[in-house]
């Protein structure tokens, strides 16, 4: 387990999908994270970046898909996603820069 000085090195980007957008009402947020990060590092990083209290973190490793190109086959990168549930009473995270 490598410790990183900046929590923004662990949390790479929010996942924008229909499923993750629907979970926002339940204070559940989905992020792309570094593949070598663990749940404890993800929890600490989210709490430091967004100043919220995290209740739980679930992770999923997604295999990169094989895609066909004009010259043959390529492969998308494999990613790791973290599904972060905020504690009850915690304020929502403003991901899109607009009022909730």
Swiss-Prot record:
Assigned GO CC terms: ribonucleoprotein complex; ribosome
UniProtKB keywords: Ribonucleoprotein, Ribosomal protein, RNA-binding, rRNA-binding
GO BP annotation list: translation
GO molecular function, one term: rRNA binding
SUPFAM superfamilies listed in its UniProt record: Ribosomal proteins S24e, L23 and L15e
Listed InterPro entries: Nucleotide-bd_a/b_plait_sf, Ribosomal_uL23-like, Ribosomal_uL23/eL15/eS24_sf, Ribosomal_uL23_CS
Zinc in keyword set: no
Keyword flag rRNA-binding: yes
NCBIfam families linked: PRK05738.2-4, PRK05738.2-5
Subunit: Part of the 50S ribosomal subunit. Contacts protein L29, and trigger factor when it is bound to the ribosome.
Entry similarity comment: Belongs to the universal ribosomal protein uL23 family.
Function: One of the early assembly proteins it binds 23S rRNA. One of the proteins that surrounds the polypeptide exit tunnel on the outside of the ribosome. Forms the main docking site for trigger factor binding to the ribosome.
Name of the featured protein: Large ribosomal subunit protein uL23
Organism: Mycobacterium tuberculosis (strain ATCC 25177 / H37Ra)
Lineage: Bacteria, Bacillati, Actinomycetota, Actinomycetes, Mycobacteriales
